[in-house]
Amino acid sequence: MAAAAAHPIVNLNCFSFLIFVIIRILNSINITSAIPRGRWELLQQSIGISAMHMQLLNNDHVIVFNCTDFGPSSLSLPDGICRNDINDFFLQHHCTSHSAEYDVFNNSIRPLMLQTDTWCSSGAVSPDGTLIQTGGFSDVGRTARIFQPCATCDWQEFPIELSAPRWYPTNQILPDGRVIVIGGQENNYEFYPKSLSISSTITSLFPITLLEQNSNLYPFVHLNVDGNLFIFAYNQAILFEHTTYSVVTTFPAILDYQPRTYPFTGSSVLLPLRNLLQQSVEAEVLICGGAPWGSYQDATSGNFTQALNTCGRIRITDPNATWTMETMPLPRVMGDMTLLPNGQVLIINDAVRGLAGWGDPVFYLVLHRPGNKNGSRFQVQNPTTIPRLY
């Protein structure tokens, strides 16, 4: 049974951890065939924690972390270290880890110490490879966390770094190396570290009207080739100039007008840039899945609507940009999309119905090949056996 989440969550893996290996598809294989492809390899039966958030770093290690207050994990902290937080609702004292470092090459796990609750936080990786994670649940919404890759490094946590509490925000790295933190129960944004040009007498919070009118929870944000930000919320998008705090372009609504951001929870990627040698580089955004309008009200009454099976694609560098729509092989809500080294897009996880979780999982992966013609871009891969959704 699918259901609306009792507590909303980021759309990432939330059950036992599985690193997958997709075997390269040979050119001789007929790509129009409906036969699923790829092979799964189980590397760890469990790493001891749930993978709510995951980030691959530049040393080929994956940082995995989860909320800290829903119960002890199966991974103990080292050297008698324990976590104490009198403000937690369920778990004020325990000695288990809610974060781990996975070494891809050695297939090994190292427990990490998280004091603050990263539930529904957001992050980005800086140019030097440092993971910057901001926001979180309850009293830690203004927290910033730093993880620098090294053999013995652990989380560094700074409780009052943000100007406003952030829960369900989105982070995006900027050309100057700073991170912009957008939304998250707020219809505004701020920078981390804060801009040196901002006077202490001037607020460092800047409103975005789009987020007032739509959802400000986990908006989709991508850095355009001109330095402006593509921001998508609910079913609409803008191109935003973050240095002048102005809207450069208002894009048309996605053609089916269906909502895609949390809690309707589709997924989005900036497609690989393909014409880097030309004078004007083109940039395209792909948004897939989600839940139809009205599904939130339906879920509260026990009716779990089928997820969307459509994708929208838009070339955000065009002066008169328009959406084109595609149909996926399967409906998906609360999935993940990631770019592969060959320029293809992997669509993974999800539920078939409901919103923001959590039953009726989609086991089949899908490859999206953006260079193919519309109608021949999707290729179903062999299924996993493990549900991965909230």
Where are these regions (language model features)?
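Beta-propeller domains
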Residues: I29-L43, Q55-L114, T134-A151, E212-G354
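Short, conserved, GDST-rich strand-edge loop motifs in beta-rich repeat architectures
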Residues: T68-H93, C288-T305, D350-V362
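Asp-box/WD-like beta-propeller blade repeats and closely related beta-sheet repeat scaffolds
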Residues: G141-P219
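Short loop/turn segments immediately following the C-termini of beta-strands
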Residues: N59, C67-D69, D128, G136-D139, ...
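Short loop/turn motifs that recur once per blade in beta-propeller domains
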Residues: E41-I49, L112-T118, P159-R166, F206-N214, ...
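Beta-propeller and closely related beta-sheet repeat lectin domains
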Residues: S50-M54, D60, S97, W119-A124, ...
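Beta-propeller blade signature
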Residues: C95-N106, R142-T152, N187-S197, Q236-E241, ...
